[in-house]
Amino acid sequence: SITELCKVLTTGPLNADTEVVVGCPAPYLSLARSQLPDTVGVAAQNCYKVAKGAFTGEISPAMLKDLNIGWVILGHSERRAIFGESGELIADKIVHALAEGLKVIACIGETLQEREAAKTEAVCFRQTKAIADKVKDWSNVVIAYEPVWAIGTGKTATPEQAQEVHAALRKWFTENVSADVSSAIRIQYGGSVTAANCRELAAKPD
């Protein structure tokens, strides 16, 4: 449960050099924020691209800030696939969230069919470019490489596969954004990460 997870993260101990952020469904954001120490961030799993208006069911960055939530996950593959969110919409969401003072975990990743067709880099670059076309300040953006075929399936990209994509993304940032952003931006891997495999994944340079 969320309460049990909060207890684990509160008692730790957590590495002081590691930033920890917990992504929660919207109804539990306040609960998680109230039970976690300030050193652990809380992220919403979605928000909309405008501050206010007639958008029934949507959550704005302003609402998240009212709950003292500092992070939001945007562009998750399930939002892209199930809810039909385009790269342009996701980029608009990211720009607005950043402008409102939130930090963003921006998700990219390929499907199994795209990987088998050797389109992994092309897909990841296209999704990243849609964001880069609109984002000018990357200091509060984390890129999350989440191959669709590894999310909730029990299949995990090998550390070598993840490193290959992360290195390619860093090179893309050097060539298309700037060397400074490329060296500074955090690129994390997500997709069936467990206690058994996290250390090996984290040991990779990118």
UniProtKB/Swiss-Prot annotation:
Family (UniProt): Belongs to the triosephosphate isomerase family.
GO molecular-function term, one example from the UniProt record: triose-phosphate isomerase activity
Organism: Culex pipiens (House mosquito)
Annotated SUPFAM superfamilies: Triosephosphate isomerase (TIM)
Reaction catalysis annotation: D-glyceraldehyde 3-phosphate = dihydroxyacetone phosphate
PROSITE patterns with a match to the protein in the record: TIM_1 (PS00171), TIM_2 (PS51440)
Pathway terms, separated by semicolons: Carbohydrate biosynthesis; gluconeogenesis; Carbohydrate degradation; glycolysis; D-glyceraldehyde 3-phosphate from glycerone phosphate: step 1/1
Name of protein: Triosephosphate isomerase
